[in-house]
From Swiss-Prot:
Its main location: cytoplasm. It comes from Shewanella denitrificans (strain OS217 / ATCC BAA-1090 / DSM 15013). This is Ribosome-binding factor A. The keyword Cytoplasm applies. Keywords: Cytoplasm, Ribosome biogenesis. The lineage of its organism: Bacteria, Pseudomonadati, Pseudomonadota, Gammaproteobacteria, Alteromonadales. GO terms for molecular function: ribosomal small subunit binding. GO terms for cellular component: cytosol. Residues 118-142 are annotated as: Disordered.
Amino acid sequence: MAKEFSRTRRIAQQLQQELAVILQRDMKDPRIGFVTVNDVDVSRDLSYAKVFVTFYEEDLTLVEQKIAALTAAAPYVRTLVAGRMKLRVMPELRFIYDSSLVEGMRMSNLVSQVITNDKAKQKQAGREDDTPSVDEQEKDTD
């Protein structure tokens, strides 16, 4: 019977917390800037860890430069993490840009834009039909 939280998942969570603190406080590289550690995926044998990160910038060339800077600093970051976590094997860190946050924001903006356009078209048409809008239906249920 498998445990609810496997050892690799617990290590990944602790590694994520330690990496977030180290990248925010201990790294002084101006090329990296503000970085957020979204997730860490550790291999079963603890030899590798995929570190999913996001940056404040959305420009793809800047993101690639920041990933390259993190990759170059990975051995140093690994030694800092090894000093904080007591593991027999410290995973090799592989930094990967996580575009899910940017994609989520883009999708949210698209949905908002479609809703705005739909409302404008309804006003322009003069609301020829008498069906209540979504907003009116929500007010009726409150």
